[in-house]
Amino acid sequence: MIPIRIVACTRHNRKDFAETPLGVTIQRFSHLSFIEAQLFTNNTVGLCQRYNEAIEAAKNDPALLVFVHDDVEIVDWYWYMRLGASLDDHHLVGLAGNCQPSPGQTSWAITDMEGTLSDRQSWAGCVARGNGEYLTSWDVFASPNREVSLIDGLFMAAYSKTFHDNDLRFDEQFTFHHYDMDLCRQFTEKGLSIYVSSISAIHHSQGLMGPAWKESAQRYLDKWQGL
């Protein structure tokens, strides 16, 4: 059985990482031998560099790679089964996304630099919000289990073979923002399908749209010319 390998970057050391939402998740499923973790602790470089290192390492050790932020807690006892079923017919899986993004969107859910939300009818999936300890609210976007064009990078999963067979990698010019949208565009260019699965999770964070985000958004728009 091919392993499920959770790939995560964190600024925490290994001991403190265990107390993060993702650290708690990994411990919660530690009894399942086919679920592994590849951790980049005390990390000071961009996510894409580390994610690409994980993809490269999987050439000789194939896996179902799950790229997850350290502030995400998976609260679904059957998430690995849902994920496997979703990847039977699709190539990239997430928890929230957009079926019909407008040209020039700066996020899967945002249309411009000012944070204007796109048409909710094109959204898919559901992610809960938390404060680091408790669930505080639900972001109910729309029904999951549907194909989309863009997904949120808080959780992205694909088989390592898909990356290798299609010469796909994360673009390292995107260190933290917009790498998710960029990867989705790459998958679409290759004719590969993207899917939002019904996996329950809590995101213990709030999104920020500061100067670094806007600079990254402009790089993304320049690369994809308004797609």
Locations of the language-model features?
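Short glycine/serine/threonine-enriched helix-capping/active-site loop
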Residues: 9, 93-98, 197-199, 204
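Short beta-strand-to-loop acidic/aromatic patch adjacent to the donor-nucleotide binding site
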Residues: 62-73
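A recurrent flexible, glycine/aromatic-enriched loop bordering the glycosyltransferase active site
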Residues: 122-158
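C-terminal catalytic/acceptor-binding lobe
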Residues: 150, 170-227
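Short, acidic/glycine-rich phosphate-metal binding loop used to engage nucleotide
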Residues: 40-47, 73
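Conserved donor NDP-sugar-binding/catalytic core segment of glycosyltransferases
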Residues: 73, 77-121
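Glycine-rich, basic loop-to-helix element that forms the pyrophosphate-binding segment
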Residues: 44-58
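N-proximal low-complexity "stem/linker" segments adjacent to membrane-targeting elements
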Residues: 1-28, 34, 38
